[in-house]
C-alpha cells in the first residue's frame, strides 16, 4: 500500500510525523494522530481515527510508528482517489454539464456501453437513484448510488 506513494509524499508525511513525534522516539501517540492528519489536509472523525488506529496499532500499545503511519495515509489517499473517480464518472454521464443526469443522458451512456435498455429500464434506474423525486439524478444522489453497494 505505502509503496504506491511518491517519494515527495513520503517526505511530506515524514516531516509531519516528525513534528508530532515530540521525544523523537519514532512513534506518535493516538491522540497526536488526529492533529497530524489535519495538518495534511485530512479531516477524520473521532470514529474514523479510532478505526485507523485499531487497524495499524498492531501491538495495541497506543502508539504508531512511521511505517504504520505511511500505510494508514496511503489507505486514506486511496479513498480520496475513488471520490475523484466518482466525480469523473458523473461528468461522463452529465453530457450537458448542468449538474444533473437526465433519463436521456443515462440512456445515451448506457447505449455507448453496449447496454440496450428499454425506456422503462432507464426510467427505473433514474427512479432508484432519484432521492428528491425531481426526475433526474444530481451529484449527491449519484454519490449515494455509487457508494451504497
Swiss-Prot record:
Kindly state one GO CC term assigned in the UniProt record.
Answer: myosin II complex
Task: List the keywords (alphabetical).
Answer: Acetylation, Calcium, Metal-binding, Methylation, Repeat
| Binding-site residues, Ca(2+) 4 | 130, 132, 134, 136, 141
Q: Where does Ca(2+) 1 bind?
A: 21, 23, 25, 27, 32
Q: Extract the InterPro entries matched here.
A: CALM/Myosin/TropC-like, EF-hand-dom_pair, EF_Hand_1_Ca_BS, EF_hand_dom
* Sites bearing N6,N6,N6-trimethyllysine, chain numbering: 116
Record Pfam families: EF-hand_7
Quote the PROSITE patterns the UniProt record gives: EF_HAND_1 (PS00018), EF_HAND_2 (PS50222)
Bridged cysteine pairs (disulfide): none
Record-level Gene Ontology MF annotations: calcium ion binding
Chain sites annotated for binding Ca(2+) 3: 94, 96, 98, 100, 105
Positions bearing N-acetylalanine: 2
Please name the SUPFAM superfamilies in this protein's record: EF-hand
Provide the residue positions that the database annotates as binding Ca(2+) 2.
Answer: 57, 59, 61, 63, 68
| Residue ranges annotated for the EF-hand domain, each copy included | 8-43, 44-79, 81-116, 117-149
Q: Which family does it belong to?
A: Belongs to the calmodulin family.
Q: What else is known?
A: This protein has four functional calcium-binding sites.
* Role, per record: Calmodulin mediates the control of a large number of enzymes, ion channels and other proteins by Ca(2+). Among the enzymes to be stimulated by the calmodulin-Ca(2+) complex are a number of protein kinases and phosphatases.
Name assigned to this protein: Calmodulin
Amino acid at each position: 500500500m505505502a509503496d504506491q506513494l511518491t517519494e515527495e509524499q513520503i517526505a511530506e508525511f515524514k516531516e509531519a510525523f516528525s513534528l508530532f513525534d515530540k521525544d523523537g522516539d519514532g512513534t506518535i501517540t493516538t491522540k497526536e494522530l488526529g492533529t497530524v492528519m489535519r495538518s495534511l489536509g485530512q479531516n477524520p472523525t473521532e470514529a474514523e481515527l479510532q478505526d485507523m488506529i485499531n487497524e495499524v496499532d498492531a501491538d495495541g500499545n497506543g502508539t504508531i510508528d512511521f511505517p504504520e503511519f505511511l500505510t494508514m495515509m496511503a489507505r486514506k489517499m486511496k479513498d480520496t482517489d475513488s471520490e475523484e473517480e466518482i466525480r469523473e464518472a458523473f461528468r461522463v454521464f452529465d453530457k450537458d454539464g448542468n449538474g444533473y443526469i437526465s433519463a436521456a443522458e443515462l440512456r445515451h451512456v448506457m447505449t455507448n456501453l453496449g447496454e440496450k435498455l428499454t425506456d422503462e429500464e432507464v426510467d427505473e434506474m433514474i427512479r432508484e437513484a432519484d432521492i428528491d423525486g425531481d426526475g433526474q439524478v444530481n451529484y449527491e444522489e449519484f454519490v449515494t448510488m455509487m457508494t451504497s453497494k
